[in-house]
Amino acid sequence: MPPNDRAEKQAAAQQAVNILHEISTILNCHLDRQTLSICISMIEKGINPEALANVVKELRKKGQENQLEAAAAAAASSSTTVPSRRR
């Protein structure tokens, strides 16, 4: 592939990612450019887009649950910690 064609393809791919990122931002999807690029690549390789969307939703849900559990554990541990006395 000639260098010029490759550069044009890269520019077109970057433009597509930028447009999809703008759409993602407008729709409050909270997907960064890297994540969008990965999703695009997976879809281009034949992954079902709807299934991929469901996986992303499930991962987000689990991530939020883990953050809540970690925050609760941190709060519980800080409330039960007795400050040490210095002599």
Curated annotation (Swiss-Prot):
Keywords: Cytoplasm, Cytoskeleton
Cellular compartment(s): Cytoplasm, Cytoskeleton, Microtubule organizing center, Spindle pole body
Main localization (coarse): cytoplasm
BP GO annotations: gamma-tubulin complex localization; microtubule nucleation by interphase microtubule organizing center; mitotic spindle assembly
Entries under InterPro entries matching the protein: MZT1 (IPR022214)
Presence of the UniProt keyword Cytoplasm in the record: yes
Annotated GO CC locations: cytoplasm; gamma-tubulin ring complex; interphase microtubule organizing center; mitotic spindle pole body; spindle
Source organism superkingdom: Eukaryota
Annotated family: Belongs to the MOZART1 family.
Biological role stated in the UniProt entry: Required for gamma-tubulin complex recruitment to the microtubule organizing center (MTOC).
Subunit structure: Part of the gamma-tubulin complex.
Name of the protein this chain belongs to: Mitotic-spindle organizing protein 1
Species per Swiss-Prot/TrEMBL record: Chaetomium globosum (strain ATCC 6205 / CBS 148.51 / DSM 1962 / NBRC 6347 / NRRL 1970)
Higher taxonomy: Eukaryota, Fungi, Dikarya, Ascomycota, Pezizomycotina
